[in-house]
């Protein structure tokens, strides 16, 4: 990593408040005068410059401040006004928090873009960028097409809020992140404004926010099929609405990577470029596993200069899709760097990629996996931690029905989304099919390549839940997540099919497995022919100077990141997860910020109704010099019976040790599809 200290422009920065033209959050009702908290880094110049916007609910004054310091000053040093804004009701912005990506959030974002374009220091052209939430709302606001917005960079984001976000996968409830992200956001939304920025009104603002809080899990579980709630904010509903130029980036170890493939397929090829590396849910320049990282800031600068300054940087002469194809590698939960190479495709679907079907062999087989199948799935959102990625899949394969295809004289290189067709007979109304594609080495080790899920009630569409006729046989087809991978000669391609996948997938009530008939079933691989690809090069990762946050050493031993405990007598499996969100850090202005979280996922081997989840969060914000000391403690739980999901959430907030807010929510939500 190169830390850059000299730039074409000197820079300055300031914190400001951006006035909105009126209206407030959905929770707050009508009104006006709301101001959003913003930090602006600008080049020292008399010439107007384009503005770049990053718009998040994650607190610019502390939580994202270290990451912001790596990027925004860098852009300012290259001649852009780089702007970081807190979403309404979060951080130091006024107003009350609303739902995830709600209409008010997007309308506010459009208003901010117009405000930026009107400033005397702005050229009138605006770009927008972000990762995850910021990548989502960059796409969503681009679909609203505000005139000043000319280009976006969207990283690790999704075009489909139902089938490619943290809530559902293949029509099934994503137990692991439906729960974990709802619990995380419950803690996050309860964090107070900082009196160092907003003054004495902080507590009044905080209490009003807390009164408006409703756990996200209620809404998410109330919508178990793809309905209008999920269509809002899903740009796949109308790709043509996006007028801005789109650079879409993702990683093969990020759950949102298929969005890059769909964007380069459906957007005007003269206005989009895609980039998929080996990365996790991180910016590609941060140097976090798995690498190799790239000079992503430099790459985005080419994009901004091309579309906001009318400079021909050559970025539109790059292939439509640049992607990393990994070489075969042994299973491990973390890789510093993966072996492989960059390839370029000038169209997508690519003329270099052809579907090759591999027929499954054998007679009918029973697929009735124990409920703990999936404990070796790895983390849904890998961030580069030591226990994030799936370990050796042999134990998972043993709980599945597997089919193997030898790789003989030539390597088989795949790029895109594999597809399976399974001929299934089932005696119960509800169930799930999970397909995993593995690379099996001569020594028997099994590396997970990709996977896919289908809620069998969603086989006719994600917008409905159709019971399976008892004893009926049907062919079902579904895609696995996209991947770039090479299977070498001497290895075997393994398709492993299971009927459960905990804790990723919430088990269906009454699940009893199914019979898989190999006749008529196949796996279809997107095989890329061997071509002499043009050389694809990126600069080395580069960032601006770090903020100077201190992470105090501790004598306490850290909890394991992922601990699996088996109670043999009870037949119960419990996974304890420490998501490693940051621990304690001390900021240059004296703020002490502490986060601690632990997630627990429990299930019994033969009882789908035994599944339960729990998350406990503690967040403390402390300024020793002023005595300010705010503490947030939350508990979030989900369980289910045959007919309902059962949720329980609790929030306790303290000011200097005194409880100022305490609320518990208990809710039963009908199981309509999940």
Roles of regions detected by a PLM:
Residues 242, 248-250:
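Short beta-strand/loop motif that positions the catalytic acidic residue
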Residues 275, 283, 289-654, 658-674:
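C-terminal, loop-rich substrate-recognition/catalytic regions characterized by aromatic stacking residues
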Residues 2-46, 408:
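N-terminal cap/lid segment of alpha/beta-hydrolase-fold proteins
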Residues 68-69, 77, 143-241:
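Accessory cap/linker subdomain of secreted extracellular hydrolases
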Residues 258-272:
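Active-site-adjacent alpha-helix of alpha/beta-hydrolase-fold enzymes
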Residues 121-132:
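Alpha/beta-hydrolase fold nucleophile elbow
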């Amino acid at each position: 990593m190169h830390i850059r200290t000299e730039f074409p422009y000197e820079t300055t920065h300031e914190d400001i408040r951006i006035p909105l033209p009126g209206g407030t959050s959905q929770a707050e009702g009508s009104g006006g005068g709301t101001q959003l908290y913003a930090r602006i880094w600008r080049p020292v110049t008399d010439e107007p410059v384009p503005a770049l916007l990053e718009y998040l609910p994650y607190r610019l004054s502390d939580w994202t401040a270290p990451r912001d310091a790596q990027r925004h000053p860098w852009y300012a040093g290259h001649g852009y006004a780089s702007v970081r804004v807190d979403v309404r009701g979060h951080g130091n912005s006024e107003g009350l928090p609303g739902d995830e990506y709600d209409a008010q959030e997007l309308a506010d974002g459009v208003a901010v873009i117009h405000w930026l374009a009107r400033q005397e220091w702005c050229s009138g052209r605006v770009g927008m960028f972000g990762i995850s939430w910021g990548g989502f709302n960059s796409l969503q606001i681009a679909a609203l097409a505000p005139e000043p917005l000319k280009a976006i960079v969207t990283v690790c984001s999704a075009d489909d809020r139902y089938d490619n976000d943290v809530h559902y996968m293949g029509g099934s409830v994503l137990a692991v992140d439906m729960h974990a992200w709802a619990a995380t956001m419950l803690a996050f939304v309860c964090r107070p404004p900082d009196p160092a920025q907003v003054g004495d009104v902080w507590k009044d603002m905080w209490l009003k926010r807390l009164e408006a809080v409703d756990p996200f899990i209620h809404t998410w579980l109330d919508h178990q099929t793809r309905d209008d709630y999920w269509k809002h904010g899903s740009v796949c509903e109308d790709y043509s609405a996006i007028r801005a130029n789109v650079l879409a980036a993702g990683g093969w170890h990020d759950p949102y990577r298929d969005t890059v493939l769909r964007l380069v397929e459906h957007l005007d090829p003269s206005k989009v470029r895609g980039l998929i590396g080996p990365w996790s849910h991180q910016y590609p320049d941060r140097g976090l596993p798995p690498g190799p990282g790239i000079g992503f800031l430099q790459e985005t600068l080419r994009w901004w200069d091309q579309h906001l300054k009318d400079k021909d940087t050559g970025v539109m002469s790059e292939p439509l899709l640049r992607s990393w194809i990994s070489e075969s590698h042994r299973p491990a939960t973390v890789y510093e760097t993966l072996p492989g190479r960059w390839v370029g495709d000038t169209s997508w679907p690519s003329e270099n990629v052809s579907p090759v079907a591999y027929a499954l062999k054998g007679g009918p087989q029973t697929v009735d996996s124990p409920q703990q199948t999936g404990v070796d799935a790895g983390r849904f959102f890998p961030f580069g931690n030591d226990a994030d990625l799936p370990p050796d899949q042999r134990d998972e394969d043993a709980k599945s029905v597997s089919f193997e295809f030898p790789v003989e004289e030539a390597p088989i290189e795949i790029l895109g989304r594999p597809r399976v067709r399974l001929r299934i007979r089932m005696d119960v109304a509800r169930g799930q099919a999970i397909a995993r594609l593995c690379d099996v080495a001569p020594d028997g080790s099994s590396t997970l390549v990709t996977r896919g899920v289908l809620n069998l009630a969603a086989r006719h569409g994600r917008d409905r839940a159709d019971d399976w006729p008892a004893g009926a046989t049907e062919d079902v087809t579904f895609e696995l997540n996209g991947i770039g991978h090479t299977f070498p000669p001497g290895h075997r391609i393994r398709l492993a099919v299971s009927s459960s996948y905990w804790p990723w997938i919430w088990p269906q009530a009454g699940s009893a497995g199914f019979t898989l008939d190999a006749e008529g079933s196949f796996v279809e691989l997107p095989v890329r022919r061997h071509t002499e690809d043009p050389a694809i090069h990126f600069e080395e990762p580069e960032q601006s100077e770090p903020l100077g946050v201190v992470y105090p050493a501790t004598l306490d031993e850290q909890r394991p990141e992922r601990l699996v405990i088996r109670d043999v007598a009870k037949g119960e499996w419990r996974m304890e997860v420490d998501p490693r969100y940051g621990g304690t850090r001390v900021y240059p202005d004296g703020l002490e910020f502490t986060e601690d979280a632990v997630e627990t996922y429990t299930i019994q081997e033969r009882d789908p109704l035994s599944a339960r989840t729990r998350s406990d969060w503690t967040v403390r914000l402390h300024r020793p010099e002023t005595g300010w000391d705010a503490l947030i403690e939350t508990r979030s739980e989900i369980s289910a019976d045959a007919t309902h999901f059962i949720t329980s959430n609790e929030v306790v907030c303290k000011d200097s040790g005194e409880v100022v807010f305490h609320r518990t929510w208990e809710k039963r939500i009908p199981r309509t599809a999940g």
